[in-house]
A protein has these predicted regions:
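Walker A (P-loop) ATP-phosphate-binding motif of ABC ATPase nucleotide-binding domains
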Residues: 4
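Hydrophobic anchor at the beta1->P-loop junction of P-loop NTPases
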Residues: 7
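P-loop (Walker A) phosphate-binding loop of NTP-binding proteins
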Residues: 10
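Conserved lysine of the Walker
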Residues: 15
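Conserved substrate/cofactor phosphate-moiety recognition/catalytic segment
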Residues: 20, 24-62
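Loop/turn-to-beta-strand initiation segments
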Residues: 70-73
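Conserved phosphate-donor/acceptor-positioning beta-strand/loop module used by diverse small-molecule
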Residues: 92-110
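Small-molecule kinase domains that catalyze NTP-dependent phosphoryl transfer to phosphate-bearing small molecules
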Residues: 113-152
Length: 158
C-alpha cells in the first residue's frame, strides 16, 4: 500500500475504530486527527461550540505535515469540507479518502453512548451542516459492523 488512507466522516461515523482496524490489517501506522487538536479547540468543542475554518487551520497544517513525514499511514480525520481535503492533499503524497457515510440517527446514537470523548452530541447537527460529501472518495455505508467495513475496504484496496 503506497497511498495514505484518510478515513473521513462526521463524529460517530467510526473513523477511529475503522482506522485502527484497517491499519492493523494493512500493517500501517494509525493516527487519530483528534489527537492533533489544540487544547483551545478541544475546550471549545467540549463546551458545545463548533469549530470555525480559522480554528481548524493549525490542526490541518499539523495533519498535512504528518502525512508528509509518516507516509504511508491511516489517518482518521473528519475532513468535512472540500477545502479541508484539498489542504491535506497539497503535497505530492498519494492520498485516498474513505468516506464513512452514516445516517444522522445512527451517528447520534453512537455519540450518546460514547464515553471519554470531548465531542458532545449537541455538535452533531453542525457536523452534518458542514459536511460537503466528497466526490472522489471510497464511499462506505458505515452503519455496518466494524469488521464488515474493514473486510469491504480490504477487498476494495487489494
Amino acid at each position: 500500500m503506497n497511498s495514505t488512507l484518510v478515513i473521513m466522516g462526521v463524529s460517530g461515523s467510526g473513523k477511529s475504530t475503522i482506522g485502527k482496524l484497517l491499519a492493523e490489517r494493512l500493517s500501517l501506522r494509525f493516527f487519530d486527527g483528534d489527537d492533533f487538536h489544540s487544547e483551545n479547540n478541544v475546550q471549545k468543542m467540549s463546551l458545545g461550540r463548533p469549530l470555525t475554518d480559522h480554528d481548524r487551520e493549525d490542526w490541518l497544517a499539523s495533519l498535512a505535515e504528518l502525512i508528509v513525514a509518516e507516509k504511508p499511514i491511516v489517518l482518521a480525520c473528519s475532513a468535512l469540507k472540500k477545502k479541508y481535503r484539498e489542504h491535506l492533499s497539497q503535497s505530492d503524497i498519494s492520498l485516498r479518502f474513505i468516506f464513512l457515510d452514516i445516517p444522522y440517527e445512527v451517528a447520534r446514537k453512537r455519540l450518546a453512548s460514547r464515553e471519554d470523548h470531548f465531542m458532545p452530541v449537541s455538535l452533531l447537527d453542525s457536523q452534518f451542516e458542514t459536511l460537503q460529501r466528497p466526490q472522489n472518495a471510497i464511499n462506505i455505508q458505515a452503519e455496518k459492523s466494524a469488521s464488515a467495513i474493514v473486510d469491504e475496504l480490504e477487498n476494495f484496496l487489494s
